Amino acid sequence: QGWAKALNKMPFVFALVGIALLSIISIPFFHMELGLPDDSFYEEGTHQRDSYDLLVEAYGEGYHASLVVVAEAEQNGEVLSKLELLQGELMSMDHVDYITNVVPKQSGEMAVIMLNPTTGPNAQETIDLVHEIRSAHIEGVKLHVTGTTAMNIDISEKLTDALPVFAVLIIGLAFIIFMVVFRSLLVPLKAVLGFVLSLGATLGFVTWVIQDGNFYEVFGFATSSPVLNFLPILTIGILFGLAMDYEVFLVSRMREEYAHSGNARKAVMAGIRESGGVVTAAGLIMIAVFAGFMMAPDPMTKIIGLALTFGVIFDAFIVRMMIVPAVMILMGKAAWYMPKWLDKILPNIDIEGESIIKELEKKK
């Protein structure tokens, strides 16, 4: 009740503060780098970290970033006579430490060259080296790069490329569904833009902590690392479902009240009073669940827990309980505007029973 009154008095202030806060937290997202955490991200004293450090001490950081270069002859040529040239070309590249093995095929049209970079698997120098080898031009020979490190780099890049398409697809579908259900243009637009804000803040916060190395010890991480390559996709999927649930909890009650009274401000107040507690309780439950992930020893599980915990905090408590009602108050009746031509085209899903109420009123 008190929160609803405060929002009703200063909706512009609450909307502005919420949007500004999430926008600022989102800034690190724009330099987010994806990768796959390795054993160097475990805490010191663990078996994984001790083994990693011993191998680095003996063979260098690049031991954990070994690359498998496949030299393939073009147009029925052969590679054997060019092995020395190939090795010289590879060793001349920046950040190549040493070649560990060369295995030519007996027929001569192919050879496998294994090499170690000077840097680790998540270093930008290693990523650049993979691209440099693939783009190298040696007459009559085509170079391919594979191995665990190269595959992780490729997966990270593929996921980065797929992220905008995935996000636009599910956000676009949600906009259409919400438009059909709530018979409005601005309500679904506000819902999906609110999700974009909370998603940006979530990934920005994770980047600031995990990648930029701010307060990572507080959350139980041993060191900074790149952001888990499949985390954005995973976060979008899970957080989007939760965010839209919270949105439906709030807005369906607002829609019901508006359909009955026609008073937009009263509808928002009813939604906050009667559904706000549900959103708060649901958010706290999910925060408790996801925070438990951060107790795990595995760095990847910790990162997932961090992202989802703060994702729910940002969406449930800042977007849904602060920005959404404040913006709804500011929009007034315009929030429920739907062009007549569009209203006729869209299927009518009467989730609030408005048609039944109208029929009953006619009979009276």
State the predicted function of each range.
Residues 31-216, 226, 248:
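Structured non-transmembrane domains adjacent to transmembrane bundles in polytopic membrane proteins
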Residues 1-34, 138, 145-364:
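Membrane-embedded transmembrane helical bundles of large multi-pass transporters/channels
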